[in-house]
């Protein structure tokens, strides 16, 4: 009876070692779970970014207002008969506002 008990105990020790430290054990399981959680967070950020870009694409494809707004803001384009004015603050005011932003 003693040999059978020792054999079963040895098998139990080996199974416990495999469970905790072996390939695909508890340590690997927790590491993979952490990797999956990090990847899901990254995927959520990228999905939000993609949704925003698709919304902008739909807006650009469907509406003239978005095209006109981008043309005016980014390319400084105007309609015939319009005059484009860009208001630039004085250098002293720009320095003051930059100094306040750094505080």
UniProtKB/Swiss-Prot annotation:
Task: Give the CC-aspect GO terms.
Answer: cell division site; cell septum; divisome complex; FtsBL complex; FtsQBL complex; plasma membrane
**One example GO MF annotation:** identical protein binding
Stretches assigned to the Cytoplasmic side: 1-3
Give membrane topology per the record: Single-pass type II membrane protein
Ranges that cross the membrane: 4-21
Motif Leucine zipper-like: positions: 41-72
Which UniProt keywords are given for this protein, alphabetically ordered?
Cell cycle, Cell division, Cell inner membrane, Cell membrane, Coiled coil, Membrane, Transmembrane, Transmembrane helix
- What is the purpose of this protein? Essential cell division protein. May link together the upstream cell division proteins, which are predominantly cytoplasmic, with the downstream cell division proteins, which are predominantly periplasmic.
Annotated PANTHER family: CELL DIVISION PROTEIN FTSB
The entry's family comment says: Belongs to the FtsB family.
Q: What is this protein called?
A: Cell division protein FtsB
């Amino acid at each position: 009876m003693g040999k059978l008990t020792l054999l079963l105990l040895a098998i139990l020790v080996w199974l416990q070692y495999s469970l905790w430290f072996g390939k695909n054990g508890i340590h690997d399981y927790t590491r993979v779970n952490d990797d999956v959680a990090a990847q899901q967070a990254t995927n959520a950020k990228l999905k939000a970014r993609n949704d925003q870009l698709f919304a902008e694409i739909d807006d650009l494809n469907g509406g003239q207002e978005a095209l006109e707004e981008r043309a005016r803001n980014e390319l400084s384009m105007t309609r015939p008969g319009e005059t484009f004015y860009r208001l630039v603050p004085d250098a002293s005011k720009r320095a003051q506002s930059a100094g306040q932003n750094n505080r």
